[in-house]
């Protein structure tokens, strides 16, 4: 007697649609925790019995320790030679982005406008992503060693340059003792964990590679906790009460404009420098990205007692979502184009 044939599994159309759009569970969870913070602000605020500060502090240190553990020094050495490309990417990340933020400063009014501008400048002072940049370059068939080098170096430079730019232009504190305290906190939570990870890299890099997906999930969960507690504090203190939905929409439109301007400028400079196709792709994808990992942890370090940290993170969250959607679409398009056509563009 014939056994009944089991029905074929129905494909998850929603998941497939999200994947084609460049979205994943983390991006949805990111906005989900903001919604949760809106409805339950006391759960993640300072008044909560849960020791969120201790949890996120340990999480930040572990994120940077695992980053050092995963850092491939051999791949970094392999990508060092193309200095013009590296200079363009790092100058875009830490010079061009902040300059654009400074140029639009006169358009922001006092009080709430100033705080919104500070959040945009903070975004512009951040380093590039590592994993997303490299994945996009791979899809677009770019120079992988150069992508790994630039994304990794950008993250390392960001440990120093992001706090430096923030202290110069955001006037974090005029009190030298508080600035010294910030330096010590950065040393303990960022520099030393990265250094420890690099020192143990040769012995435990294989372990980090085997558990790469789990470590990535740990990074993402840490970010979600930081974002949740930041927005809980902001909602509890009424930071967003003076902002309308139209303000958020304008901010989102501004992030789209920022991304398009940056990509256009990088592509134009790549043509002027006569980069080959593979290097143009690296310049565009590594130079236009901003790291949500670094942004979240740096915000928790640079604005530890501020109820406005949620607002500080808002442009970064919007830009992060846009860069994933727009960059994934662009990477897939470039990956399908003949090399000669992209090189001539």
Q: Where are the regions that the model predicts?
A:
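Helix-loop junctions at the membrane interface of multi-pass solute transporters
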Residues: 78-79, 131-143, 242, 268-271, ...
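The feature identifies polytopic integral membrane transport proteins across all domains of life
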Residues: 83-90, 111-125, 142-152, 249-252, ...
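Long, low-complexity C-terminal extensions of enzymes
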Residues: 305-307, 320-322, 338-345
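Membrane-interface helix-loop-helix junctions at boundaries between adjacent transmembrane segments
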Residues: 105-161, 170-182
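Helix-helix packing/entry segments at the starts of transmembrane helices
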Residues: 211-218, 275-291, 297-298
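Extracellular/periplasmic helix-loop-helix junctions in multi-pass membrane proteins
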Residues: 46-47, 238-245, 299-317
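Membrane-embedded alpha-helical segments of transport systems
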Residues: 28, 92-100, 125-130, 147-168, ...
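Structural signature of multi-pass alpha-helical membrane transport proteins
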Residues: 2-111, 167, 171-277, 338, ...
């Amino acid at each position: 007697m014939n056994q009944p044939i089991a029905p074929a599994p129905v494909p998850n159309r929603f998941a497939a649609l999200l994947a084609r759009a460049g979205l994943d569970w983390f991006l949805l969870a990111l906005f989900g925790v903001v919604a949760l913070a809106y409805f339950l602000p006391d759960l993640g605020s300072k008044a909560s019995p849960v020791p969120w500060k201790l949890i996120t502090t340990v999480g930040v240190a572990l994120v940077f320790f695992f980053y050092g553990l995963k850092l491939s020094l051999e791949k970094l050495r392999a990508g060092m030679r193309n200095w013009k490309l590296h200079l363009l990417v790092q100058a875009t990340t830490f010079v061009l982005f902040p300059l654009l933020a400074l140029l639009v400063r006169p358009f922001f009014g006092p009080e709430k406008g100033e705080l919104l501008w500070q959040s945009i400048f903070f975004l512009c002072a951040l380093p590039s992503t590592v994993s997303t940049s490299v994945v996009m370059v791979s899809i677009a068939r770019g120079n992988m060693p150069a992508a790994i080098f630039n994304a990794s170096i950008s993250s390392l430079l960001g440990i120093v340059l992001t706090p430096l730019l923030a202290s110069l232009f955001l006037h974090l504190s005029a009190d030298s003792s508080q600035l010294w305290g910030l330096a010590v906190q950065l040393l303990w939570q960022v520099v030393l964990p990265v250094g420890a990870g690099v020192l143990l890299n040769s012995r435990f890099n294989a372990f980090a590679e085997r558990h790469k997906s789990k470590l990535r999930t740990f990074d993402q969960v840490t970010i979600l906790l930081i974002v949740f507690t930041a927005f809980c504090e902001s909602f509890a203190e009424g930071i967003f009460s003076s902002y309308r939905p139209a303000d958020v929409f304008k901010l989102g439109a501004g992030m789209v404009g920022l991304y398009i301007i940056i990509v256009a400028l990088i592509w134009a400079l790549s043509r002027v420098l006569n980069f080959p196709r593979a290097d143009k792709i690296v310049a565009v994808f590594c130079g236009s990205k901003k790291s949500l990992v670094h942004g979240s942890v740096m915000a928790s370090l640079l604005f530890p007692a501020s109820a406005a940290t949620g607002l500080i993170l808002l442009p970064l969250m919007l830009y992060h979502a846009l860069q994933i959607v727009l960059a994934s679409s662009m990477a897939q398009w470039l990956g399908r184009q003949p090399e000669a056509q992209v090189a001539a563009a």
